[in-house]
């Protein structure tokens, strides 16, 4: 809805976007995030044929954490195959019968995502399979509703718990947190405007961080005590 009014403000000289005056509903510190583990995602993706459109779409959603609107706006020109980088610089949505491609919602949403080698190869194979694809053509010329429908059907086939398309983004973050990736790096990868958004949304997924701090202090204190003892002996 915000994107729709933003478009209206730009194109039809709407004086103000009313959505920007409405506070976000609910608690931003959401402890009820719904996401898949890596095993659950693998169970889901295995229901699709590798190399197909939807297979690659879900691969990119899970392994980059991009938003669905950002994914649907990606063109061949946004992919740097030499540097393994994906440029996020626009977003797509559909209103009525019109396809709208506009700038991302915040300055921080403009970003370059480093992608793993295997994902780069999957994208390259898909692009090469569409010979003559123009650099400015959308990789995935479908609408969000089609992605949602496909995901719902494959969830039933896979027998995994039901989540939304946007929850795949949460799944990406949960995976990164499990691997020990720092919040600041996650913020930049997701395109969050403020680190507080990242921490308020995902901070509770760091259950072992306080224990790590205590262990770190124990180690430092032990080193300090050892050092003091050695100094006394030398004196």
Regions found by a protein language model. Name each.
Residues 83, 102-110, 114-119, 125, ...:
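C-terminal secondary-structure termini that scaffold catalytic or DNA-interacting sites
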Residues 1-21, 67:
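N-terminal DNA-binding recognition helix of tyrosine site-specific recombinases/integrases
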Residues 35, 92, 120, 145, ...:
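Catalytic-site neighborhood detector that most strongly recognizes the C-terminal catalytic loop/helix
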Residues 13-16, 27-47, 95-117, 133-136:
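DNA breakage-rejoining catalytic core of tyrosine-based enzymes
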Residues 39, 91, 116-161:
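Active-site/catalytic core of tyrosine-dependent DNA strand-transfer enzymes
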Residues 49-57, 80, 85-87:
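Conserved catalytic core of the tyrosine transesterase superfamily
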Residues 10, 53, 59, 63, ...:
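C-terminal catalytic core of tyrosine-transesterase DNA break-rejoin enzymes
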